[in-house]
Amino acid sequence: MSGNTALDYIQHHLTNLAVGEGYWTFHVDSLIMSFSLGALFCYLFWLGARRATAGVPSGLQNFVELMVEFVDQTTRETFQGKSRLIAPLALTIFCWIFLMNLMDLVPIDMVPSLMYAAGVDYFKILPTVDLNVTFALSISVFFLIIAYSFKGKGAGGFAKELLFHPFGPWLLPFNLILNIIELIAKPISLSLRLFGNMYAAELIFILISLLPWWIQWALGTPWAIFHILVIPLQAFIFMMLTVVYLSMANEHEEH
C-alpha cells in the first residue's frame, strides 16, 4: 500500500479505483459500494415486510415500521399536495444515504489493506466522498423538480414563473437569469453539502490514523461518537431538502 509519507497515505485513502480516461472515467469502488448498499436496503425492507406479522413484531419489522412511519409522517407535514411517489422516494433517499455514510465508521485501514492484499491498489468504501455520487443523487432530484414543476403548474405556468417572477414582465431577462440560477443552485448545494461534510469527516479520520495508537484512541473515539450524529443528520437534511424542493415545484400557480 502506498504510504511512504503522510501525504502519500492521505492521497492513497482519497483515491478511487478508476477505469477509463477523461470524461469516461468510472469510479468502480463507488459504483460497487453504492449499488451494494442500495441492494442491502431493498433486501432488508423486503425481508422486514415479508416477515411482518400481526402478533409480536420482530426487531427487523420494528425497524422497518419505524422508518416507514417516520418518513411518511415527515413527508405529510412537509409536502404540500398529493403524490404517491414522495414518501417512497424520501424513504429511499434517507436510508440509502444513511447506509453510504455509515461506511465512514469502518476502520480506515481495514478494507484498503484487504483490497491491497488482493492486488487492488485503491478502494474507497465511502461513496459520499465521491462528487460523482453526490452529484448523481442531486441531478436526479433536479430532474424530479423539473417534472413536478410541469405537473403542478403546467408548461405555461412554469414558463410564466421563470419569465415573470419575481419582478414582473418589465424585468423579464433579469427574472429568467435569477430563476435559472436559483434552479441550478438547488442540486449543486445538495451535492456539495453532503460531499463537503462527509469528505471533511473522512479526512479527520485519516489524519487521526496517522497519530500514535494511544492518541488515536483518545481522539478517534469521541470523533466517531460525534460522527454517529452526523451520519443520519446529513441523510435527513438531503431528504428534507428534496421534499421541500419538490413541494415548492408542485405548488399550483396562484392568480
UniProtKB/Swiss-Prot annotation:
GO CC annotations? plasma membrane; proton-transporting ATP synthase complex
Query: How does the record classify its membrane topology?
Result: Multi-pass membrane protein
- In Gene Ontology terms, what is one molecular function of this protein? proton-transporting ATP synthase activity, rotational mechanism
Q: Which Pfam families match?
A: ATP-synt_A
The record ties this protein, via InterPro entries, to: ATP_syn_F0_a_bact/chloroplast (IPR045082), ATP_synth_F0_asu (IPR000568), ATP_synth_F0_asu_AS (IPR023011), F0_ATP_A_sf (IPR035908)
Keywords tagged on the record: ATP synthesis, Cell inner membrane, Cell membrane, CF(0), Hydrogen ion transport, Ion transport, Membrane, Transmembrane, Transmembrane helix, Transport
**Major place of localization?**
membrane
Q: For this entry, list what GO says about its biological process.
A: proton motive force-driven plasma membrane ATP synthesis
Q: Where in the cell is it found?
A: Cell inner membrane
Residue spans crossing the bilayer:
28-48, 86-106, 125-145, 164-184, 203-223, 224-244
The protein's job, in short, is: Key component of the proton channel; it plays a direct role in the translocation of protons across the membrane.
Fill in the subunit field for this protein: F-type ATPases have 2 components, CF(1) - the catalytic core - and CF(0) - the membrane proton channel. CF(1) has five subunits: alpha(3), beta(3), gamma(1), delta(1), epsilon(1). CF(0) has three main subunits: a(1), b(2) and c(9-12). The alpha and beta chains form an alternating ring which encloses part of the gamma chain. CF(1) is attached to CF(0) by a central stalk formed by the gamma and epsilon chains, while a peripheral stalk is formed by the delta and b chains.
Q: Which family does it belong to?
A: Belongs to the ATPase A chain family.
Extract the NCBIfam families matched here. ATP_synt_6_or_A, PRK05815.1-1
Q: What is this protein called?
A: ATP synthase subunit a
Q: Which organism is it from?
A: Alkalilimnicola ehrlichii (strain ATCC BAA-1101 / DSM 17681 / MLHE-1)
